[in-house]
Design a protein with these regions (language model features):
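Alpha/beta enzyme core
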Residues: 1-195
């Protein structure tokens, strides 16, 4: 099918600029939003401020907006659920949730990451929202490019299956650049795949 290109924005002004340029949907990137507000990436920007910025972005245009929530702002699945509810209140129609720890970048266990995604899905369902949960896995992002191989692909697919069962709608695989591995992933993944170029 035809890929959907998401324009990353960081404030209301960049959202309007992207809309004027022909974007059909918008996304935020955690790094750019944090930097624009004087913070470093990795959930250092307070969640309340992120939601204020998100609400200004969603009000700036009529386009759907998905928000980068990093790992969900909190140690427990219940914290993730609260973050999802707040993002829905701020006008988001979806989010990215990553499977690594914000402080260290280390990957969470598959079971822990899936539990956080399941909590996110329950929160969206409770809100009655048609909310797209894009499960980000950092399997390739954390590995040097010269180590990208079938082993990492298999790990990514195992996570994709677990995340799909937990209620995720999409799979985001930053760091994956090999056309051959992208083709293999999209052919086998139970979820639609998002890559970053």
């Amino acid at each position: 099918g035809q890929p959907l290109a998401l324009f990353n924005v960081w404030d209301a002004g960049s959202a309007r600029t992207a809309a004027d340029a022909g974007a059909v949907a918008l996304a935020t990137g955690s790094w750019s939003v944090a930097a624009a507000n004087g913070f470093v990436d990795g959930e250092q920007m307070p969640r309340a401020l992120l939601m204020e910025v998100l609400e200004r972005i969603t009000r700036a245009t009529d386009l759907p907006v998905t928000v980068d929530l990093e790992s969900g702002y909190g140690e427990r699945p219940e914290d993730v659920a609260e973050t999802i509810a707040l993002s829905i209140e701020a006008g988001a129609v979806g989010c990215n949730l990553e499977d690594s720890f914000p402080a260290t970048g280390e990957l969470r266990d598959v079971e822990e990451a899936a539990a956080r995604l399941a909590a996110a899905r329950r929160a969206a369902d409770r809100a009655g929202a048609d909310y797209f949960i894009n499960a980000r896995t950092d399997v390739f992002f954390k590995a040097p490019a010269d180590t990208h191989d079938e082993r990492l692909l298999d790990e990514t697919l195992a996570r994709a299956r677990a995340y799909a069962a937990a209620g995720a709608d999409g799979l985001f695989v930053p760091g994956l650049q090999s056309p051959a591995l992208i083709r293999a992933l999209t052919a086998a993944s139970p979820l639609p795949v998002n890559v970053m170029r």
